[in-house]
From Swiss-Prot:
GO CC aspect terms: kinetochore; nucleus
One Gene Ontology term from the biological process aspect of the record: cell division
Name of the protein: Inner kinetochore subunit CTF3
Keyword entries, A-Z: Acetylation, Cell cycle, Cell division, Centromere, Chromosome, Kinetochore, Meiosis, Mitosis, Nucleus
Organism: Saccharomyces cerevisiae (strain ATCC 204508 / S288c) (Baker's yeast)
Gene giving rise to this polypeptide: CTF3
Length: 733
């Protein structure tokens, strides 16, 4: 439909004095209809602004009607559109005396429209922001623009840096001009905004007192109202054009947030404005503004009377450089700024409708909608606030942990999950497992869709969920829920699309190791009375782990099997979980050391016939190479290279002149090495105590068992469950 509106705007642009009135009327009727139906893009609006401000074939009343009823954006607006409007505001100067003068009533209508759609414009860079805020203040000096430029000036002022002495001078001079009817009220509101940003300032206070705007006028200016009919049409167009970015409730709440910045101006003043200059005046409530507190001692002394300013947006921002207008007595308040979020939550009694809560929710929504230039500064603040209140964390999780926000911004969602989930506990057990299973399943489907098989989002989020479960299992009320959800996470982590990419995606390995470590710690507890079904992992999962080529994962599995030993001894051998665990131990000892894979009934649930057929079809360098040599710690994928490295370290430690050069350690290569170097070994020796392959494997295991070795639990497993190796256990040494 953009093409239809392009044609309509082009037709209007090409119209001139010779265009038949009926043709122009028909084109305008189409503009009225189609703009309300589909909305206008930023380039289309820019073309219309230029047309309305420069054409003479459309009367002023019609131009104003078009701005008020047809300027309905279908998405975000550009700074080019903003510059187009600015270029047509004001009156001709000595430098632009021949510029076409835009009618003042049309200029006012354009500024009014900007106020209604301000939330759709991008966040400026710091330099652009400084220039833009200066331009708006200069335009504010035109009396016919003051009413609608005042909100723009207020919204543009967001940091103490925006408060400049020259701005105060301009505002005060205009406010005192007798011909400017709206200036006193507008100027006072802007000054109150500045005061919110810089705190107590004698220069700002004196200006407000000098202007002396009466309460009734100030209240009427502060009570800004927008066109509800226009906004209802705008919300419908935005939500239909971009449902993910512009849900109707999000748009309305964003607008309300901007309006509240104006409605609440002055509400945090310590003294009524007219009595500000009277030194003998004592306020009835004896409140002390948080802005005036500069030390912990002051904070403690004034706690009952402490008043929280309404400018949450500034209070939650990272510390900024002090402004030149700040008096020395409050220059150090930034040192307390890290406490502001805590103070706000405590003073608001954790009221979910309070402004800090709403600020956190809407700032996060703006982050997901890419409306914030520096989300890396905002998100840590929100995480810090939510970490102190579980209810706020619950609201954030319920609102943002879903596929909708994942699609909007994966990185932001990962930051939110990483910061909030590990410390969060559910208030209600019912529905929590289902919520997270649905959430993680949706992330899995999204992460493994076509072309995204190596996406880390799923496994990284799993890791954060498991950190959360680690916290849950310390709570007796949540342990059953936590362990049930843990097994759900393990099932997802061992799905082929994730597990097969574990080597390139370490988050999946970290997540699964975390899940096993949780079960390991619970199994070690002497007073553990958790049902055994929560502690034993099913064969579909464990068999994949055992056959993994990841030594860290294999070591974690061995650590888990050793930890569950004492727990399982409390149950009869006929118990299905005991039999399941015994099968794990039998398979893993055969695989790692006993070398009875091909003679056993099965290995990890797979028939030995399968392995025989594979091994018989492998290319072997020597004809007498036996199939059995492919197994044990020195031959399996997870440990073969590690064993080579350990052997080289053993040779270096004993300063051997002869080096084992084969890339494979097994009985055949070892015997061949001894046969070739028999005389040299007899003369110079090799590794002390190593005379056969069994001795070498024991030496390697002893080296593995070192407490500093990340794979030490593999050795501990074999020392625990193999009688022939039990004498090498650390406990028996």
């Amino acid at each position: 439909m953009s093409l239809i509106l392009d044609d309509i705007i082009l037709s209007l642009t090409n119209a001139n004095e010779r265009t038949p009135p009926q043709a122009l009327k028909t084109t305008l009727s189409l503009l009225y209809e189609k703009s309300k139906q589909y909305g206008l893009s930023s380039p289309q609006l820019q073309a219309l602004v230029r047309l309305l401000c420069e054409t003479s074939i459309i009367d002023t009343v019609t131009k104003v009607y078009i701005v008020e009823n047809c300027f309905l954006p279908d998405g975000y607006l550009t700074k080019e559109l903003l510059l187009e409007i600015i270029n047509h505001l004001g009156t001709p100067t000595v430098f632009s005396r021949y510029r076409i003068q835009t009618p003042p009533v049309l200029q006012s209508a354009l500024c009014k429209w900007l106020v209604h759609v301000y939330f759709l414009f991008p966040v400026h860079s710091e330099r652009e922001h400084n220039i833009s805020s200066s331009i708006w203040l200069h335009l504010w000096q035109f009396s016919f623009l003051q009413k609608w430029i005042t909100p723009l000036v207020i919204w543009q002022a967001t940091t103490p840096v925006d408060v400049k002495p020259w701005k105060l001078s301009i505002i005060k001079r205009c406010a005192m001009h007798p011909g400017y009817r709206d200036a006193p009220g507008s100027a006072t509101l802007i000054l109150q905004r500045f005061q919110c940003l810089v705190g107590a300032s004698s220069q700002i206070t004196e200006s407000i007192i000098t202007i002396n705007c009466n309460r009734k006028t100030l209240k009427s200016h502060r009570n800004l109202k927008l066109d509800a009919h226009f906004l209802s049409i705008l919300k419908r167009i935005l939500s239909r054009a971009h449902p993910a970015n512009f849900p109707a409730d999000t748009v309305q709440n964003t607008i309300d947030m901007y309006l509240s910045e104006i409605h609440q101006l002055g509400a945090d003043s310590i003294y009524p404005l007219r009595l500000q200059s009277l030194p003998e005046y004592v306020p009835s409530d004896s409140t002390v503004s948080l802005w005036d507190v500069t030390s912990l001692e002051q904070l403690a002394q004034n706690w009952p009377q402490l008043h929280i300013p309404n400018d949450v947006d500034y209070m939650m921002k990272p510390s900024l450089n002090s402004n030149v207008l700040l008096p020395r007595k409050v220059m150090s308040r930034d040192s307390l700024k890290h406490l502001y979020s805590s103070i706000i939550l405590i003073k608001n009694s954790r009221d979910e409708s309070s402004s800090p809560y709403e600020w956190c929710i809407w700032q996060l929504k703006r982050c997901f909608a890419h409306q914030i230039e520096t989300p890396q500064e905002v998100i840590p603040i929100i995480i810090s606030v939510s970490s102190m209140d579980n209810k706020l964390s619950s609201r954030i999780i319920q609102t943002f942990c879903n596929l909708k926000y994942l699609k909007l911004d994966e990185l932001t969602l990962k930051k939110v999950c990483g910061g909030i989930l590990p410390l969060w506990k559910p208030e209600l057990i019912s529905g929590t497992r289902e919520f997270f299973v649905k959430f993680m399943a949706s992330i899995f489907m999204w992460s493994t869709r076509d072309g995204h098989d190596n996406n880390c989002t799923f496994s990284e989020t799993c890791f954060y969920v498991l950190q959360m479960i680690t916290n849950w299992v310390l709570d007796d009320k949540l342990i059953a829920l936590g362990l049930t959800l843990l097994h759900d996470m393990q099932s997802l982590l061992t799905l082929d699309k994730i597990f097969n990419n574990a080597t390139s995606n370490r988050f999946s390995t970290m997540a699964f190791i975390s899940s096993l470590d949780i079960l390991t710690q619970l199994s070690k507890q002497t007073k553990s009375d958790y049902a055994i079904q929560y502690l034993i992992v099913g064969p579909d999962i464990m068999n994949k782990v055992f056959s993994s080529d990841d030594p860290l994962l294999l070591s974690a599995a061995c650590r888990y099997l050793v930890a569950t030993k004492n727990k399982l001894m409390q149950y009869p051998s006929t118990n299905k979980f005991v039999r399941m665990q015994n099968q794990y131990i039998m398979d893993l000892t055969n695989y790692l050391y006993r070398n009875k894979v091909l003679s056993s009934k099965s290995l990890f649930g797979v028939s030995p016939d399968f392995f025989k057929q594979i091994l018989e079809n492998l290319y072997i360098p020597t004809a007498d190479f036996k199939n059995a040599k492919f197994f044990t710690i020195t031959g399996i994928p997870a440990l073969s290279y590690i064993c080579i490295i350990i052997l080289r370290r053993l040779e270096t430690a004993e300063n051997t002149k002869i080096k084992f050069t084969s890339g494979i350690i097994n009985e055949e290569t070892f015997n061949n090495f001894f046969r070739v170097h028999h005389d040299e070994i007899g003369q110079h020796g090799w590794i002390k105590g190593v005379n056969n392959i069994h001795d070498l494997r024991v030496k390697i295991l002893m080296h593995l068992s070192n407490t500093a070795n990340p794979y030490r639990d593999i050795a501990a497993f074999l020392f625990t469950y193999l009688k022939s190796l039990s004498k090498y256990s650390v406990q028996n040494s």
